A protein has these predicted regions:
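Surface-exposed loop and adjacent secondary-structure segments within mature catalytic domains
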Residues: 1-72, 104, 110-114
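Short, glycine/acidic-rich beta->alpha junctions
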Residues: 26-27, 75-76, 85
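C-terminal functional module detector
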Residues: 49-59, 64-66, 78-192
């Protein structure tokens, strides 16, 4: 990812500097359009839920949004995964705290009505670097848990093929010239 890009906000409420109002993106669709217009293909974006139903079909763009949030301090949202798969989206699944306190997996519930302990995401990365994290997100090599004391687990899912298979390095429904490679094995998140 490139540093120093324009900050795009959904609002300038409570922000004194109003000099960049023209970069505001009031909807997710506007945000994805701005990314595409500026050829910012390496951004990371997740569909986040604040405890209430959100229709992922209104703004999902698989070029930028590689995962959806299934759990946070606001509850568990399995419906977003069902909606994504029903619509043919190839997404990974993440869990977050949404606690804003820097306590992954140990945040307080978001609200009494639909609150829960914050979730966790396990990223299956070869090393702890920004590039590995971005690659892990883009290839959906991650999974979510509901957090808490029992939510810290390591899970690996893989398969082997009896015959040669083809792995797509991106969603072939989104990329016109999607790069492929032959494979005899695949892991969680791979598109074969």
């Amino acid at each position: 990812p490139v540093e120093g890009r324009k900050m795009r906000r959904s609002s300038h409420a409570l922000i004194e500097d109003q000099s960049d109002l023209d970069t505001d993106c009031h909807t997710a669709s506007e945000l994805f359009e701005a990314f595409a217009d500026n050829k910012e293909w390496d951004v990371i974006s997740f569909a986040h839920c604040g405890g209430r139903y959100a229709d992922i079909t209104k703004a999902h763009d698989g070029r930028f949004e590689k995962s959806v949030e299934v759990h946070s301090a606001w509850g568990t949202f399995e419906w977003i995964v069902h909606d994504a798969f029903k619509n043919g989206y190839r997404v990974g699944i993440i869990g977050n705290s949404d606690g804003h306190k820097g306590r992954p997996g140990a945040s307080y519930p978001g609200a009494g009505w639909f609150g829960a302990i914050g979730g966790l995401t396990c990223f299956l990365m070869p090393d702890l670097s920004r590039n590995s994290l971005v690659e892990c997100i883009n290839t959906r090599h991650h999974y979510a848990t509901t957090g808490g004391p029992s939510g810290r687990m390591r899970l690996e899912v893989s398969m082997s093929f009896d015959e040669p298979a083809t792995q797509y390095l991106d969603d072939p429904l989104l990329a016109k010239n999607c790069t492929t490679k032959p494979c005899s094995q695949a892991m969680m998140g791979d598109i074969v």
